[in-house]
A protein has these predicted regions:
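A glycosyltransferase accessory/donor-loop signature
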Residues: 1-12, 18-19, 29, 36-68, ...
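Alpha-helix N-cap/loop-to-helix initiation residues
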Residues: 13-14, 107
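A short acidic (Asp/Glu
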Residues: 17-18, 46-47, 110-112, 137
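Short, acidic, metal-binding catalytic loop of nucleotide-sugar glycosyltransferases
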Residues: 23-31
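Short, structured active-site "lid" loops
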Residues: 49-93
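A short catalytic or substrate-binding loop motif that flags glycine-/basic-rich loops and adjacent residues
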Residues: 81-83, 147-150
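GT-A fold catalytic core of metal-dependent nucleotide-sugar glycosyltransferases
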Residues: 84-132, 157
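Short beta-strand-to-loop element that shapes/binds the nucleotide-sugar donor at the catalytic cleft/hinge
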Residues: 124-147
Length: 245
């Protein structure tokens, strides 16, 4: 099966994206296309039509608001521009295995081996976190939100040709509240394959493991105030310096 990787892009997290992309390529043992998932491109191509607006947060910064996701206890603010755009990946990839990951990850393992291990009977693979974040703020002053299957969607391997993913139409992606998309509502439980925790290890949240293949700085990357000493922060900074050299 064809293989591809899509990394979420947000202009406020350019350094994080650089680390994610360069660390992924550094560990690859075979050529796999890697591209950024850029909201402006998806809007201009007509793929992304979800209504959005902007609000100013408590730090005076603009934040994107997903209007379809607003409810009585949630104002619709999303942490990144790719919050809901990720669900377009099977449509863009069209065939084979397509990995999406948030931009605040660092790869320490070979994604080619991950692809080799997958079973095509599953529509999607992810790490099935039992992660209940505490209320409050996370990276860049973003509000921490809670929803079913929190962080499952931060690292998804889509089987683009799977029959079940035909239900993930452009209309569905562009009309459902984000919380429904993030809980993988178009799939039955048995259609979701499980990856080991090492493929989406949450810094500051997950229990220690010997050798995480992907470190996810979900609370904040090491260049953000308060997260400079996160686990694997020195490795992250070294990767950033290598990219910039």
């Amino acid at each position: 099966l064809q293989r591809s990787v899509f990394i979420g892009w947000d202009p406020r997290e350019a350094a994080a994206f650089a680390v994610a992309r360069s660390s992924l390529k550094r560990h690859l043992t075979q050529p796999i296309p890697v591209r950024g998932l850029v909201l402006d491109d998806l809007i201009s191509s007509g793929l992304y039509t979800r209504p959005t607006t902007r609000k100013v947060n408590g730090e005076g910064r603009f934040e994107m608001v997903d209007i379809l996701s607003i409810r009585e206890d949630y104002d619709g603010r999303v942490a990144t521009q790719h919050a809901n755009a990720r669900f377009l990946v099977p449509h863009i990839a069209k065939e084979g295995w397509a990995l999406f990951c948030d931009g605040d990850v660092m790869f320490r393992g070979n994604v080619a081996r991950l692809f080799d291990s997958l079973n095509p009977k599953y529509a999607v693979y992810c790490v099935k976190h039992k992660h209940e974040p505490s209320a409050g703020m996370k990276m860049d002053g973003q509000q921490q939100t809670r929803y079913a299957r929190k962080n499952w969607s931060s690292f998804l391997v889509f089987n683009a040709q799977h029959e079940a993913n035909r239900a993930l139409t452009l209309d569905l992606v562009n009309t459902l509240p984000g919380r429904d998309l993030h809980r993988l509502c178009w799939l039955e439980d048995g259609q979701i394959g499980e990856l080991g925790i090492e493929w989406n290890w949450l810094a500051g949240c997950s229990k220690p493991v010997d050798d995480p293949k992907v470190v996810h700085f979900t609370l904040g990357t090491p260049d953000m105030a308060g997260y400079e000493r996160s686990a694997y922060s020195d490795e992250w900074r070294a990767q950033l310096n290598n990219w910039a050299a």
